[in-house]
């Protein structure tokens, strides 16, 4: 019997089965058999019956192949797995057992919509009439009315999630910024993201030169002994041509951003960063009048991809990291020379496992980027890097930067910018709290990984940004969209 001890195990196992079958060339034959292999039955282990469990696996297989889980596909990277949804309560406010059925009936008096009725043992809220204003909860002297909402809806920073008539979550394509927080927060795993693992495997099997671009947020995510060299050795064993740190792209981005910031500052203009695709999506969808203020500098991922393709036009580039929005940058933004694919940690590990490759401890000897490029994975890292570059090049302007840490702070900063009330000159926006290290597909919680991450980065050499960039032909590719 398949034992699901966590939703993470289910996600990982589906990816592994798909990756293994893809390498073996048997996915067409195995596709319909994988659910039965994983869910043997006869007793269910995590849902009401084995048939629902198998359908959940079946829809996750479709996601693993880069398809929508159901028949309809709106093009969004983030998708609701309908067979796994609808088990959460929809009613936002509920009367709990704390209700004393008192004579005061303050809750009923506070409701302006007639949504609360007296009951035999406690008051009752009619969900059809309730407007979720919360006045009843505030009025109850016993705190007997609780605010209960779905984790997916709570986690969405742009109110892109609602429900259909059957209680299944619906993602509004026009509002969604692809941050992926809903997928991370759903305790039933009812929201997932499309993957490109079958595409990457097809290119590996075809003998193409596939390069991994590893996110700077990776250091610290897998323990103190797993270094960039560990990753480089592992992906090469799995068939990749080589691995390049995306932090190197951070150094490249820093140089270009510094030039943009200085020009804008001297012209009295405001700007926002462009390296976080979730933040960029937020601006374009919810503050479109500010879109022209987005830096034209490409992301570190794109910078490294362009560098690789300038050397080898036939190269295939694959970003690896904790970010869901990077998939959106690849699929939606269509930036020339950008990475061909983006994978999260579970997806690259599934590819490695299918090739019997594991991450192994290795000395921290491999380094492409400066320490400042490595800290691009943290909120505030872009600002620190740009200011360091200005210092190195003796361009010391009194530039003020708003470091917007997380979607809520991003919205606040953009609102001030929109109204002409932003006191700072620039906004560094990170849609995830903590920066990329807080991405929805992270392998470890920020607080647990922090010390390990800091120690790994401290062990790197202290090369300057300007010196590091001299190693590369920066004139062979453009740093702008």
Where are these regions (language model features)?
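Gly-rich Lys/Arg/Thr-decorated short loops/hinges at beta-loop-alpha junctions or inter-strand turns
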Residues: 88-94, 117-122, 163, 181, ...
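N-terminal [4Fe-4S]-dependent radical SAM core
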Residues: 70-96, 113-114
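Short strand-loop junctions, especially beta-strand C-caps/beta-turns
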Residues: 98, 128, 215-217
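Iron-sulfur-associated redox domains of electron-transfer enzymes in respiratory
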Residues: 1-60, 64-66, 193-481
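Glycine-rich adenosyl-nucleotide cofactor-binding module
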Residues: 88-109, 138
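Residue-level recognition of alpha-helix initiation/capping sites
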Residues: 102, 131, 147, 177, ...
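Iron-sulfur cluster-binding cysteine motifs and their immediate structural context
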Residues: 104-127, 131, 135-177, 181-197, ...
């Amino acid at each position: 019997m398949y034992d699901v001890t966590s939703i993470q195990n289910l996600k990982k196992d589906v990816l592994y089965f798909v990756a293994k079958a893809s390498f073996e060339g048997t996915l067409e034959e195995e596709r319909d058999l994988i659910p039965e292999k994983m869910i043997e039955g006869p007793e269910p282990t995590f849902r009401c019956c084995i048939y629902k469990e198998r359908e959940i696996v079946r829809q996750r297989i479709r996601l693993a192949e880069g398809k929508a889980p159901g028949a309809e596909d709106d093009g969004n990277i983030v998708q609701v797995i309908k067979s796994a949804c609808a088990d959460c309560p929809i009613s936002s406010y509920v009367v709990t057992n704390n209700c004393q059925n008192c004579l005061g009936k303050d809750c009923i008096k506070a409701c302006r919509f007639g949504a609360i009725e007296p009951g035999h043992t406690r008051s009752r809220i009619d969900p059809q009439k309730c407007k979720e204003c919360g006045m009843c909860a505030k009025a109850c002297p016993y705190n007997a009315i609780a605010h209960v909402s779905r984790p997916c809806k709570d986690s969405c920073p742009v109110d892109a999630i609602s429900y259909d008539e059957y209680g299944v979550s619906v993602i509004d394509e026009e509002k969604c910024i692809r941050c992926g927080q809903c997928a991370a927060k759903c305790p039933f795993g009812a929201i997932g993201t499309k993957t490109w693992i079958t595409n990457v495997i097809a290119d590996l099997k075809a003998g193409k030169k596939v390069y991994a671009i590893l996110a700077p947020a990776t250091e610290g995510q897998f323990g103190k002994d797993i270094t960039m060299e560990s990753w480089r050795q592992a992906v090469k064993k799995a068939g990749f041509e080589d691995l390049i740190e995306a932090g190197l792209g951070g150094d490249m981005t820093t140089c270009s951003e510094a030039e943009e910031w200085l020009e804008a500052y001297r012209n009295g203009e405001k700007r926002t960063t462009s390296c976080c695709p979730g933040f960029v999506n937020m601006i374009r969808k919810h503050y479109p009048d500010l879109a022209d203020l987005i830096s034209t500098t490409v992301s570190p991922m794109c910078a490294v991809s362009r560098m690789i393709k300038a050397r080898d036009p036939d190269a295939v580039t694959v970003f690896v990291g904790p970010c869901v929005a990077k998939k959106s940058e690849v699929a939606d933004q269509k930036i020339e020379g950008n990475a061909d694919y983006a994978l999260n940690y579970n997806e690259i590990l599934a590819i490695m496992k299918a090739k019997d490759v594991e991450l192994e401890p290795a000395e921290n000897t491999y380094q492409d980027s400066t320490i400042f490029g490595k800290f691009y994975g943290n909120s505030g890292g872009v600002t620190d890097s740009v200011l360091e570059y200005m210092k190195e090049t003796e361009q010391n302007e009194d530039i003020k930067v708003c470091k917007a840490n997380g979607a809520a702070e991003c919205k606040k900063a953009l609102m001030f910018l929109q109204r002409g009330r932003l006191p700072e000159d620039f906004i560094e926006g990170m849609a995830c709290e903590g920066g990329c290290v807080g991405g929805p597909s992270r392998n470890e919680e920020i607080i647990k990984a922090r010390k390990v991450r800091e120690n790994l980065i401290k062990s790197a050499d202290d090369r300057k940004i300007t010196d590091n960039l001299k190693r590369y032909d920066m004139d062979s590719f453009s740093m702008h969209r």
